[in-house]
Amino acid sequence: MQGAIAESAKNAHRDYTMIENLDPQQAWDLLQNNSDAVLVDVRTKVEHSFVGHPPGAISIPWKEAPDWQVNPQFVAEVKKIVLDRNAPILLLCRSGQRSLDAAKALEEAGYQLLINIVDGFEGALDEHKHRGNLGGWRFQGLPWEQS
């Protein structure tokens, strides 16, 4: 699948939008092999700083505490960072839902290659209601840091 994504990312003149789902390892591989790819962390600023984030991830929250309403400036903030609407944009949240919602908003704004990182940074809850034990960026042992 990653080969198809990489090939799609090279095609700069498409007339359709695509939201792909990649696991964290596939997303990391794409980031390493495509210098045009941009990783947007849609979690809150607190999550990004204190829970951790992949190196190079750009923090643009989809929702922010305390009201957890959609950030009305989200698309505008992405537009400031990602000028090429055909560049691959990878979206990361805690477990994969906020990033999918953010991808849909970017799709409506005309971005062409959107990638939701399934399981996000921390993954789903395990039987003890803990994250980070079943999947996610950190669980897969990928590079991350705190700020």
Positions of predicted regions on the chain:
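Conserved G/P- and acidic residue-centered "switch" motifs that form tight phosphate/ATP-binding loops
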Residues: 41, 96
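Rhodanese-like catalytic fold shared by cysteine-dependent sulfurtransferases
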Residues: 1-37, 45-88, 99-147
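Short, surface-exposed ligand- or partner-binding patches at beta-edge/loop junctions that are enriched
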Residues: 92
